[in-house]
């Protein structure tokens, strides 16, 4: 395992540095590192690392979501209003509709199988989008109109909506029926996640304040460890109560961080955000190298040109969905184009659930996985490069 960790960090950082030298986003190098070192090419990563890959990826995602929550200005988010809510489900819904309408014609699957494929593909990647929106907030690009805050909030909720739909469509493809309860669970999951996170965040704030008043000074480094541990517990709670009620653990993590920012002094929240930013340097490498390692590149050839056509058509539907979310806002056409670009990347969810239909024995399983792999390899570079190279031209600096 130690050798694997050494390879992940050293080769991942080296490839990231090379990509940055040629003006490409570093995550492209990390993703390529994972693909090459992973089990489907050189097979240099130990099974023990790959066995806990999903948990490590989730931990890395927790770190960037905590930084996001500690950087998020809620007053700016309030300015945005309803588009932030619409961005959490409208673009994904449009993309799924694109698959349902065109996948049977282009790829020869049934409508239900097309719905399963659309649900796999519908989520934007918070791992790609969130750190970039945090960077924009720190640099002051688009913050006057709350653009990065809106995209960050939408990307955090988007996954919940898509995963619930995926579970429902998968049941239908296996001969089951859609359950109204599954759809009701979407808002319940979001609301309970926010409430749980806010409660835990407030209790943590009170704990730190009480310790300070009793002359037990808790260092910010210690606070970081406590917050990280509590975040892991929130995700564990999501699993513990899943049989009874749905709670979004990741949304609870963001809400907890937001509550800590609101209640704490500016100095403390800024210091904590900086510390999570430093932790993200290592977490980002782990996340994207392991996402790359989960990608079976052999399925790229199986997907073929028709899969590429389908991905492109569905992304056009997604772009229309993003534009609809912007209706009634004061955003310029440049800012709307940026929102479309920011909502392109696929990675985290697709790497996590892309192989589930195949494991479930669906006849479309191989095709779904092939399309998911192709989408990751294509949209991560395009989305990351698109955001990094256009935000200074498309957004206003505050």
Task: Please place each PLM-identified region on the residue numbering.
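Transmembrane helical cores of multi-pass secondary ion antiporters/exchangers
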Residues: 1-398
């Amino acid at each position: 395992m130690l050798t694997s960790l050494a390879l992940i960090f050293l080769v991942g950082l080296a490839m990231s540095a090379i990509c940055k030298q040629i003006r490409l986003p570093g995550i492209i190098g990390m993703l390529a590192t994972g693909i090459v070192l992973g089990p489907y090419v050189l097979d240099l990563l130990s099974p023990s690392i790959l066995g806990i890959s999903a948990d490590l990826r989730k931990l890395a995602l927790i770190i960037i979501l905590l930084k996001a929550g500690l950087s998020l200005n809620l007053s700016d988010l309030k300015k945005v209003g309803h588009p932030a809510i619409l961005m959490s489900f409208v673009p994904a819904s449009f993309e799924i509709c694109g698959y349902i309408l065109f996948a049977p014609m282009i790829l020869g699957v049934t409508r239900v199988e097309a719905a399963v494929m659309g649900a796999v593909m519908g989520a934007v990647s918070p791992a790609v989008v969130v750190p970039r929106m945090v960077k924009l907030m720190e640099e002051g690009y688009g913050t006057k109109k709350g653009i990065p805050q809106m995209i960050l909030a939408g990307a955090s909720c988007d996954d919940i909506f898509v995963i619930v739909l995926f579970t429902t469509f998968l049941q239908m493809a296996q001969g089951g029926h859609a359950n109204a309860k599954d759809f009701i669970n979407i808002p319940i999951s979001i609301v309970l996640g926010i409430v749980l996170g806010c409660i835990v965040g407030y209790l943590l704030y009170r704990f730190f304040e009480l310790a300070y008043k009793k002359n037990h000074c808790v260092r910010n480094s210690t606070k970081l460890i406590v917050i990280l541990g509590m975040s892991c517990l929130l995700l564990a709670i999501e699993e513990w109560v899943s049989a009874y009620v749905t709670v979004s653990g990741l949304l609870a993590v963001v809400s907890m961080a937001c509550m800590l920012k609101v209640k704490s002094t500016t100095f403390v929240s800024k210091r904590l955000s900086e510390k999570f930013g430093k932790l993200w340097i290592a977490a980002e490498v782990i996340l994207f190298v392991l996402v790359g390692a989960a990608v079976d590149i052999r399925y790229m050839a199986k997907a073929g040109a028709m899969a590429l056509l389908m991905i492109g058509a569905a992304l056009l539907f997604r772009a229309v969905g993003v534009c609809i979310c912007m209706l009634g806002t004061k955003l310029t056409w440049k800012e709307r184009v940026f929102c479309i670009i920011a909502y392109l990347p696929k990675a985290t969810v697709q790497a996590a659930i892309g192989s589930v239909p195949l494991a479930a024995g669906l006849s479309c399983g191989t095709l779904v996985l092939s399309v998911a792999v192709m989408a990751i390899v294509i949209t991560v570079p395009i989305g990351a490069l698109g955001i990094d190279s256009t935000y200074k031209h498309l957004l206003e600096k505050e």
